[in-house]
Amino acid sequence: MSAATLIATKPTGTGPFAKFAARPLVVALITLALITAARVNGRVDSDVAWQLWIAGRIHAGANLYTDIVETNPPLWFWMAVPVERLAALLDVRIESLLILAVGFITALSLAATDRLALHIEPIRRGLLLAYAAIVLAAMPWMHVGQREQIVLITTLPYAALVASRREERSVSALTAASIGVGAALGFALKQYFLLVPAILELWLLAGQRRGWRAIRPETLALVAVGISYAAAIAFIEPDFITRIVPLIRLAYGVFGAPGIQYLFGPFAIVGLLLLGALSLRFRVLAGRSTPIASAMAVAAVAFALVYFIQFKGWPYHTIPLIGCASIALASLLAEGKETPPWLRVFAHALFILPLVLSAEEELNPALPSPDLLNAVSGLRAGESVAFLTTETAIPWSVTLQGHYRYASRYNGFWMMRAIIRNEHSPNPDPRLTALGRQIASDTARDFACIPPQRIIVTRPRPGESTFDTLPFFLRDRSFASLLSHYRVRSRTSLETYELASPFPAASSGCRKGV
């Protein structure tokens, strides 16, 4: 029997299974515990590895946005600092502790949602929450700890709360405020995510009309967290505003999907299929009989807009779209009085498909590639390594995992695309020209302060038209002089240089905490 059939059919009976299934939150938490236990010794993706590394450098005294160049706002990195500290105190893998922390906030999300879904009879609610646990914890398997997973986890109870408001159900101020704080922290991770509470609020306004009230515990919590976060950036990390925002405006625009076709990968197509299935039940969702399903469908539409506005096409950007749409479909079956047979069959495939894609992504990762593993083979934990690549995922699929010391202030040279395009422009922007010189100079200084045992360079193969990074850096005399101390170790899709004649590390002008 499929998950769709289980949710859509009201089980009966008084046996042990029925009694157990009648405890919805227990069923969901056991499901979550099993997933977390299976995941706890796994790896994290390159972005999360970079996040965790930064947390350690912050504790060591590095200044974010000066000693480390990062384009994202600081909240995500601040979230990782206590995880890094606790992992160091307990002497455990930081990745494992992060996975446990994500499991904990997922449990809070499920518990809050359970309190807001009491209109669904217990067995159906248990099945719905168990499926939600799978979506929140297992579907983003390879991307555990990503901002998209966190915002999905915090959106679920917030959407359920907005649904309760639309139905004028009583919710305690403490519960509403707590959900609002959690949701605010999720929405604050990216400015794009703010579109989601805005669209949910418009949906609530359309449903309540004159009965709508803007001032509620959860909206006050959203505003309070937002103001506090903005103030924290201004006073604690002003360099984000003065240094990083201008860098983003100057060079980040060309760092994205080469064309619109790249936005329609397998994960995006699954998300759109889920939205299509929901649209077939538009009349039901537009009514009052399935409030949580309706709210989650609205959130899914909002996250679809977020995905396309970002215009990157990266699979993990679809996590909240797929997650909200999947839970909306499951809620439609759980809350609905009558479920058409075709929907049960269709839902069976759509419930499973995102998990199949996630499993395929985990079993066949693009990185670390065999060439990359060969490039770092023989390096010992604590030895320094450096990369010259525009793809930030390359260094951060091995650096944290191998416990290497990272030599650069840049997680990758993504800005080179804008710099090289500018060089070929008939009217080059002098700011981008100056940025290119600064990056080469900064890199030479970083490598002089932390002499890498190996420098790994992405270079085009014969016949490829992609940009060759190394000659650009060799224009800088200091960098060229430094590279003269290295010999070529291997040439594959990556060119690896091994330190051949050691040189004394620079003693001045070096960054802190790295």
What are these regions (language model features)?
Residues T5-A8, T14, V196-V223, L280-A286, ...:
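Perimembrane helix-loop-helix junctions
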Residues V40-I54, Y65-V83, N364-P368:
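Extracytoplasmic catalytic/substrate-binding loops of multi-pass membrane glycan-assembly enzymes
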Residues N72, Y192-F193, F235-P238, H348-G513:
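Extracytoplasmic
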Residues L110-L136, L152-I153, R169-S170:
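Transmembrane-helix signature of polytopic, membrane-embedded enzymes
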Residues W141-V151, W314-P315:
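Short acidic/glycine- and proline-prone juxtamembrane loop motifs at membrane-interface regions
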Residues I150-R169, T175-A183, A325-A328:
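Specific aromatic-rich, kink-prone transmembrane helix
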Residues I153-T154, L195-V196, Q310-P340:
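Hydrophobic/aromatic-rich transmembrane helices and adjacent perimembrane loops
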Residues S172-Q191, P197-L202, A300-F308:
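Membrane-interface alpha helices of multi-pass inner-membrane proteins
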